[in-house]
């Protein structure tokens, strides 16, 4: 017998996508969000073809156009001193029906919230979950003492997930020795419809346009020994960002100098959870597999999770459905997490023979065999979880 009702914990991208995907299959869904409103800080997202496949299957791709999401043309790798191009990877090559887009996080959250509401999802705000208990009928306790039960509880509340700790024990996060700043500035720099990775020794800057090219999203990563807290809501003085990237030149320097407000967070490496489900409780998104930002796949993996979970629940008995979900998702997200963790080292090479050789190899590869460089990511971008199996 199928699952008829569910509680989803967390009003971020993964939670909203899961609520919308489950409700569109006829399930009664309640979404619990601890904040007083479902809002997002100003930041951008890169939605690659694999994530867009999910949004398209949910009938939401046109909403991205309405919100002036930018279709990405390329990823450009460049040197930090003056912005000299090292390599250009064409994102328009071989993408088929699914383009690569840059979207404001708040816009995607609003799109998914609208889809959830159209599916008659009940949204409860200010609902902080204090405890999750798996069982024949799983239940949770809110911080105000009230209890809720459902046939399925989906924990999509991120790295501080209550259910992750219940199913897997204490987290074993490790500080990577890297911190990241986030900021959004006006596009007064003629930034093209491309994602730029400006590479310097021990640091790199990612930039891409948002909202029809009116804004530019910045993510600046620096290697350092000192620890910083996880989560991107920790405000920092833009002067610290400018000091860390003082030797960057060209457009990168101009954009950094334009930052008026930024957040800073420490990058921690988390293992992919070994156990994703137990007694009607299941993990989704960062609650199951937090990933570093160096492959821009956090939101895309959450969208894939949401679709596969909903599809599994629709077509299989409860415990079989959750086991199928984990079996399909765990190997893929493990590969993504490992690939993301390896990218920072490639961006942060110090001056010397290795850096020169690496940059020369990138330049030659993107010039002589660009299709091969782009094709190296086919396993990631051309994976469509919505395709009939």
Language model segments and positions:
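C-terminal helical "tail/cap" subdomain of flavin- and related membrane-associated enzymes
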Residues: 1-4, 66, 82, 295-296, ...
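Conserved N-terminal helical subregion
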Residues: 2-6, 23, 48-184, 225-242, ...
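Residues at the starts of beta-strands that form the adenosine-phosphate
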Residues: 5, 28, 214-218
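Conserved mid-domain beta->alpha element of the FAD-binding
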Residues: 11-24, 28, 32-35, 154-155, ...
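Short glycine/proline- and charge-enriched loop/turn segments
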Residues: 33-36, 90-96, 223-227, 306, ...
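Short helix-loop capping/hinge motifs at secondary-structure junctions, enriched
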Residues: 62, 83, 187-192, 213, ...
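Active-site substrate-recognition segment that forms the wall
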Residues: 195-228, 238-240, 245-246, 250
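Flavin-binding catalytic cores
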Residues: 231-263, 318, 326
């Amino acid at each position: 017998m199928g699952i008829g009702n569910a509680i989803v914990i967390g009003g971020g991208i993964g939670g909203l996508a899961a609520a919308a995907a489950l409700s569109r299959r006829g399930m009664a869904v309640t979404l619990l969000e601890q904040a007083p409103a479902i809002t997002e800080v100003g930041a951008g997202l890169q939605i690659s073809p694999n994530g867009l496949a999910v949004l398209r299957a949910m009938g939401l791709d046109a909403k991205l156009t309405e919100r002036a999401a930018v279709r990405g043309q390329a990823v450009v790798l460049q040197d930090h001193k003056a912005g000299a191009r090292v390599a250009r990877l064409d994102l328009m090559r071989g993408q088929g029906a699914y383009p690569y887009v840059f979207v404001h996080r708040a816009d995607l959250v609003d799109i998914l919230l609208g889809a959830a509401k159209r599916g008659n999802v009940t949204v409860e705000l200010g609902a902080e979950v204090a405890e999750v208990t798996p069982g024949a009928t799983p239940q949770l306790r809110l911080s105000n003492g009230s209890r809720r039960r459902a046939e399925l509880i989906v924990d999509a509340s991120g790295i501080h997930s209550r259910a992750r700790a219940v199913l897997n024990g204490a987290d074993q996060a490790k500080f990577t020795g890297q911190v990241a700043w986030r900021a959004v500035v006006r596009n007064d720099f003629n930034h093209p419809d491309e994602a730029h990775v400006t590479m310097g020794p021990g640091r790199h800057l990612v930039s891409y346009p948002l909202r029809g090219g009116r804004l530019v999203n910045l993510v600046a990563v620096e290697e350092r020994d000192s620890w910083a807290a996880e989560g991107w809501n920790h405000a920092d003085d833009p002067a610290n960002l400018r000091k860390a990237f003082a030797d960057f030149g060209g457009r990168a320097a101009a954009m950094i100098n334009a930052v008026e407000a930024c957040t800073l967070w420490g990058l921690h490496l988390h293992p992919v959870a070994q156990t994703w489900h137990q007694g009607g409780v299941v993990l989704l998104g960062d609650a199951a597999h937090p990933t570093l930002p160096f492959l821009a796949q956090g939101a895309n993996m959450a969208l894939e999770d949401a679709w596969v979970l909903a599809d599994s629940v629709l077509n299989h008995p409860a415990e079989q459905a959750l086991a199928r979900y984990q079996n399909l998702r765990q190997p893929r997200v493990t590969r993504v997490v490992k690939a993301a963790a390896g990218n920072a080292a490639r961006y942060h090479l110090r001056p010397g023979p290795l850096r020169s050789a690496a940059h020369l190899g990138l330049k030659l590869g993107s010039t002589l065999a660009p299709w091969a460089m782009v094709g190296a990511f086919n396993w990631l971008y051309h994976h469509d979880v919505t395709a009939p199996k």
